[in-house]
Amino acid sequence: MKVVAAYLLAVLSGKASPTSADIKTILGSVGAETEDSQIELLLKEVKGKDLAELIAAGREKLASVPSGGGGGVAVASATSGGGGGGGASAAESKKEEKKEEKEESDDDMGFSLFE
């Protein structure tokens, strides 16, 4: 994400087609490190594309991704357990929460940003 942010800053500063050096300069100014391969991949993917169109396409893709609502059910079932069995259900819900956290990662959610 920091490479994308640096690219956007370069475009907003007036560079119509930022180079790898431009992005490295921006990232270096804040002490951020990145791999050259990430920068080159981004530049290859956005080459010849309009920034406004890329942002609009990204918004459309994000709008199709379902969000929220899943965690509330587990919390409600854990808190609704009565009396003596409450301890066991609380332990089960903690295990479920840990599993869910591992599943959530910085993957591409099934789509590419630049398609």
Curated annotation (Swiss-Prot):
Residues bearing Phosphoserine? S105
Gene3D superfamilies (UniProt xref): 1.10.10.1410
- Tell me where on the tree of life, at the top rank, the source sits: Eukaryota
- Keyword set, alphabetical order: Phosphoprotein, Ribonucleoprotein, Ribosomal protein
Molecular functions per Gene Ontology: mRNA binding; structural constituent of ribosome
Write down the Pfam families for this protein, in alphabetical order: Ribosomal_60s
Protein name as catalogued: Large ribosomal subunit protein P2y
The annotated regions of Basic and acidic residues compositional bias extend over 92-102
- Cellular component annotations (GO), alphabetically ordered: chloroplast; cytosolic large ribosomal subunit; cytosolic ribosome; nucleolus; peroxisome; secretory vesicle
Q: Where is this region: Disordered?
A: 63-115
- Gene that encodes it: RPP2B
Its assembly, as annotated, is: P1 and P2 exist as dimers at the large ribosomal subunit.
Q: What InterPro entries does the record tag this protein with?
A: P1/P2_N_sf, Ribosomal_P1/P2, Ribosomal_P2
